[in-house]
């Protein structure tokens, strides 16, 4: 069996990735595909934690722009991530991958509350852990959640899976055909160039805690496994 480069990873999924071509909601075929890819990685013995966004259902920023109270809009976004997390848990357990959902906002009838040491214990037992409801606080993105949880559980890398791009480019490759893809970057370069991979709070957390980030496309089957095994795909961001 081919060995993995990493022992413990955080997989960051955007909510949009779960909607597939329909652009909204949850596409069962996408859930099946992602679940299969996560299983491939778990079967290598890698400990997998997942943070999923909620943009396929609701974005707090959009609600705020509509005139809603920003905190209320963000809490709605957190609830959307829980819906996505439960769908992904179901997809994983359908193919016999033992999975736990932990939420930053307590709802014990639905999932476990987030407890760092319990999450680590689940990972050590080779269960997949899905962190839902963001950080539990408004004004913080799920990218920041991924960075925070990665630091807390001492993950070796954050795998940022994208559904519409295969790495980080100098410009939007859909609008600018001459845009070049970066193979590697530092966090400072990413921030200074305004590349918009993740927000500055998340970037600073990763940089300060020396957590590398790999941005890649999830649309090609097997890509998560390839990244975990050390293949050079996408863009790697690290250090200062």
UniProtKB/Swiss-Prot annotation:
UniProt keyword annotations, A-Z: Allosteric enzyme, ATP-binding, Cytoplasm, Kinase, Nucleotide-binding, Pyrimidine biosynthesis, Transferase
GO molecular function: ATP binding; UMP kinase activity
Pathway connected to this protein: Pyrimidine metabolism; CTP biosynthesis via de novo pathway; UDP from UMP (UMPK route): step 1/1
InterPro entries, A to Z: AceGlu_kinase-like_sf, Asp/Glu/Uridylate_kinase, Uridylate_kinase, Uridylate_kinase_bac
Main localization, broad class: cytoplasm
Binding locations of ATP: 12-15, 55, 59, 163, 169, 172
Subcellular location: Cytoplasm
Lipid metabolism is among the record's keywords: no
Region (Involved in allosteric activation by GTP): 20-25
Catalytic activities: UMP + ATP = UDP + ADP
Function as written in the Swiss-Prot or TrEMBL entry: Catalyzes the reversible phosphorylation of UMP to UDP.
UniProt family annotation: Belongs to the UMP kinase family.
Subunit organization: Homohexamer.
Cited NCBIfam families: pyrH_bact (TIGR02075)
Protein name (database record): Uridylate kinase
Organism expressing this protein natively: Oceanobacillus iheyensis (strain DSM 14371 / CIP 107618 / JCM 11309 / KCTC 3954 / HTE831)
Classification of source organism: Bacteria, Bacillati, Bacillota, Bacilli, Bacillales
Gene that encodes it: pyrH
């Amino acid at each position: 069996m081919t060995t993995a480069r990493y022992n413990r990873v955080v997989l960051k999924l955007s909510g949009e990735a779960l909607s597939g071509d329909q652009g909204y909601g949850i596409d069962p075929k996408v859930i099946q595909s992602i679940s299969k890819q996560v299983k491939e990685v778990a079967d290598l013995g890698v400990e997998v934690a997942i943070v999923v966004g909620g943009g396929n259902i609701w974005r707090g920023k959009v609600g705020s722009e509509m005139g809603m109270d920003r905190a209320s809009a963000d809490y709605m976004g957190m609830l959307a991530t829980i819906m996505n997390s439960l769908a992904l848990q179901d997809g994983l357990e359908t193919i016999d991958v033992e999975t736990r959902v932990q939420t930053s906002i307590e709802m014990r009838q639905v999932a476990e509350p987030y407890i760092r040491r319990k999450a680590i214990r689940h990972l050590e037992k080779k269960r997949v852990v899905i962190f839902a409801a963001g950080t539990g606080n408004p004004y913080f993105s799920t990218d920041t959640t991924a960075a925070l949880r990665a630091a807390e559980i001492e993950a070796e890398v954050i795998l940022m899976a994208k559904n519409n791009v295969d790495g980080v480019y100098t410009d939007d490759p859909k609008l600018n055909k001459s845009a070049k893809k970066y193979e590697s970057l530092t966090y400072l370069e990413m921030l200074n160039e305004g590349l918009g991979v993740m927000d500055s709070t998340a970037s600073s957390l990763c940089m300060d805690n020396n957590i590398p980030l790999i941005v890649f496309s999830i649309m090609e089957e097997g890509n998560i496994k390839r990244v975990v095994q050390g293949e050079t795909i996408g863009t790697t961001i690290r250090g200062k």
